[in-house]
Swiss-Prot record:
Species whose genome carries this gene: Synechococcus sp. (strain CC9311)
HAMAP family: PSII_PsbU (MF_00589)
Subcellular location: Cellular thylakoid membrane
Protein name: Photosystem II extrinsic protein U
Signal peptide: 1-29
UniProt lineage: Bacteria, Bacillati, Cyanobacteriota, Cyanophyceae, Synechococcales
Length: 125
């Protein structure tokens, strides 16, 4: 009797393993998406005016930190040209026109604006 029970147990275990190998898990059927990665891919190498912190403007001489802060606090934007609706000096308008092709606007995302603090996003050198 013990021998029969051990054989049946073994068959059940082997059958379970085979079924597990043949039937893919439901997790692999639905691709897991990371919202932050999707948003970063959408903007490419450009600075997203609705989802970037002030630090992203360091690559543009004359914009960091004052003008960048004004842009960040003035959002959200519908399109890149909405920045020109801010109270800008002539110098700031010239800078914006100079770097305009480096900016993009996507919908604001909590994944990239955690804590809604885009002035000090906690990235320290």
């Amino acid at each position: 009797m013990k021998r029969l029970l051990s054989w049946l147990t073994g068959l059940v275990v082997i059958a379970g393993l085979l079924i597990g190998l043949l039937v893919p898990p439901s997790v692999s059927a639905a691709e897991i998406r990371n919202v932050a990665d999707d948003k970063l891919a959408e903007r490419g190498d450009k600075v997203d005016l609705n989802n970037s912190s002030v630090r992203r403007f360091q690559q543009f001489p004359g914009m960091y930190p004052t003008f960048a802060g004004k842009i960040v606090l003035g959002g959200p934007y519908e399109n890149v040209d909405d920045v020109l609706k801010l109270d800008l000096s002539e110098r700031q308008k010239e800078l914006f026109e100079k770097y305009r092709d480096n900016f993009v606007v996507t919908a604001p995302s909590i994944a990239l604006n955690e804590g809604f603090d885009r002035i000090n996003d906690g990235q320290f050198r």
